[in-house]
Design a protein with these regions (language model features):
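Charge-rich, low-complexity N-terminal segments
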Residues: 1-47
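Conserved short hydrophobic interaction patches
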Residues: 16-19, 80-88, 120-134
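Short beta-strand micro-motifs enriched in acidic
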Residues: 27, 53-55, 94-96
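Hydrophobic residues embedded in beta-strands of well-ordered beta-sheets
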Residues: 32-34, 59-60, 100-101
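Long, continuous compositionally biased terminal/linker segments
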Residues: 40-67
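Short, internal acidic amphipathic alpha-helical interface segments
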Residues: 63-104
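Well-ordered alpha/beta subsegment
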Residues: 95-122, 130-143
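Short, highly charged C-terminal tails/helix-capping segments
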Residues: 136-172
Length: 172
């Protein structure tokens, strides 16, 4: 990133992830696009898979693998995703080609920095937590949420750092 070119490079984004206490599980480079796989924890929902995509033609996208492919009555699921799009600003719910519900955030380069990335990740995690009961049927057999008593999340500092920017989701 330079004053004449505000587009962050892959090493800059990797530096932001380190500063946020996040270690990618994989990196994929394809042409000019770089993607990192992450596994993060919400306060209530754990092991949430993300892909962070840096596309020099677009910006940065955080993409949450929200649930496995939907197998129930699709109409009801589509209605739920559309309702969530109305209820949660700044994010978009959609279906991947394989039928998996996804949750994404697009950050244009003009505002992209470490904190915008951190807020996007924290917001997505908080939404996953808020929708835990409603999405349990997609996530676990019989919709039974596993007992997670005593489990500690791997990235609580992310919530602490951005709680003041997400009071409606993080209760600050």
């Amino acid at each position: 990133m330079s004053p004449s070119d505000p587009t962050p490079t892959a090493p800059v984004v990797e530096g932001w992830l380190v500063e946020l206490g996040i270690k990618p599980t994989a990196r994929v480079d394809r042409d000019d696009v770089v993607a990192w796989d992450l596994q993060l924890d919400g306060r209530r929902r754990f092991d949430i898979r993300f892909t962070v995509i840096l596309d020099p033609a677009l910006g940065l996208i955080t993409w949450v693998h929200f649930a496995p492919p939907i197998g129930d009555g699709l109409r009801k699921s589509y209605q739920r995703l559309l309702r969530w799009n109305d209820e949660f600003p700044f994010v978009k719910f959609s279906l991947a080609e394989d039928g998996r519900p996804t949750l994404s955030t697009e950050i244009p380069f003009r505002i992209l920095d470490r904190d915008e990335l951190g807020v996007a990740l924290a917001r997505s995690l908080a939404i996953c937590d808020a929708l835990l009961e409603e999405s349990a049927g997609w996530l676990w057999i019989g919709g039974r949420i596993p007992d997670l008593a005593g489990r500690v999340g791997r990235n609580p500092e992310l919530f602490e750092r951005y709680a003041s920017r997400l009071p409606e989701l993080l209760g600050s």
